[in-house]
Amino acid sequence: MEHIARFFFGVSGNVIALFLFLSPVVTFWRIIKKRSTEDFSGVPYNMTLLNCLLSAWYGLPFVSPNNILVTTINGTGSVIEAIYVVIFLIFAERKARLKMMGLLGLVTSIFTMVVLVSLLALHGQGRKLFCGLAATIFSICMYASPLSIMRLVIKTKSVEFMPFLLSLSVFLCGTSWFIYGLLGRDPFIAIPNGCGSFLGLMQLILYAIYRNHKGATPAAAAGKGDAADEVEDAKKAAAAVEMADAKTNKVVADDADADADGKSADDKVASQV
């Protein structure tokens, strides 16, 4: 019975994870149509690619027996993420392309090192421990990536940038693999996905709290969420503070300008008469 339950949660995790892997398709279709990556960051796709590669390697029978479902979904995810990275490299500007190539080189180096060490220097339980630790570290990093979005939701009191279905999928995916890991008594699967389940739950709670809030304006939210340009963010924040401090003076100045415009118009009419 336990074996059947574990298989069920593994298959469920495969289906939900596939949805998560395919969720950026709209973004990349936009990149292809505009032939530009605009302000999108390619870092998450490189990190997800590394996580998928390490997890797929960990699930192989000679590394971790009875975890083939881990390999199937992460192998599929590796292909999907690799396609995203290639598209990004094609349409990115030179500076972003060089950064992506550097990250891709780092991803390839880390994965190659893990594979070679596990094959040539380790065996049995030692191999499983080494590969499991590597996969766990990067899985937790991947699940922690939405923390910046959660911070943005709290600051703006708006869930505009945190879609409900995506948050629900993160929660369900993490929960499915967490239970799968528990049933298989595998901490390298249970721990990172337990973290993912918890963070997904936190996103759902934030959604329940702020779903009816108007929140900040889209322009203000975009300004606060632009992590790629810290200098510009600082300027916007300073301008917002200055506007708040000088609100009364601004109203008076506007009224004075309106009076001046009205007087100028009257003088112009009088001169014409």
UniProtKB/Swiss-Prot annotation:
Pfam families hit by this protein: MtN3_slv
Primary localization class, coarse: membrane
UniProt topological domain (Cytoplasmic) ranges: 28-42, 93-101, 150-163, 210-273
Intervals, Extracellular compartment: 1-6, 64-71, 123-128, 185-188
Transmembrane domains' residue ranges: 7-27, 43-63, 72-92, 102-122, 129-149, 164-184, 189-209
Subcellular location: Cell membrane
Membrane topology: Multi-pass membrane protein
Subunit architecture: Forms homooligomers and/or heterooligomers.
Family: Belongs to the SWEET sugar transporter family.
Protein name, UniProt field: Bidirectional sugar transporter SWEET1a
Organism per entry: Oryza sativa subsp. japonica
